Amino acid sequence: MSLAAVIVLSPVLLAIALAIRIEDGGPVLYKAQRVGRYGKPVTVYKFRSMRLHADRLEDMLTPEELAEYHKNYKLTSDPRVTKVGALLRKTSLDELPQLFNILMGQLSLVGPRPVLQEETELYGDKRSLLLSCKPGLTGLWQSRGRSNVTYENGRRQEMELRYVRERSLWLDFKILLWTVKAVVRMDGAR
């Protein structure tokens, strides 16, 4: 299924790659280290949506922005995001290269969000439960909450762990439908 999606979406993938390249001339893809199933490291691919060297947080963010980032691993209004990147994020098209992660067997189509090592600590004694499941391109959090649901009040953890506990083919099907709806409506997109 992922191979078919890559083939069908290849004109879109190429157009996005060209837009990124034209905007600032940098690399098209961003490689992010995430934690996969059983805690194994996974390199997740995304279309680059930020300016070059955006990982140098201290150089690019104000102290207030840094505090917000370290609290939620996200910023409400991130000054590092490019114009093309903002559109890609709003439409979730920045995630399309993860189809290659699915082809390589590193991600599943549906599962908990692939997270940073530091984020796994926010799951406390449920960390091993989270990591017992292969991360996915989409999941309960992405389809039902996204940026509107954070770690701060524990709701994001609840959603991700609920998926792991209740996963089934039927739930995956519902999540795929909810994902299409969320992407089309840009629910929780930033």
Regions found by a protein language model. Name each.
Residues T76, G124-R190:
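C-terminal terminal-structure detector
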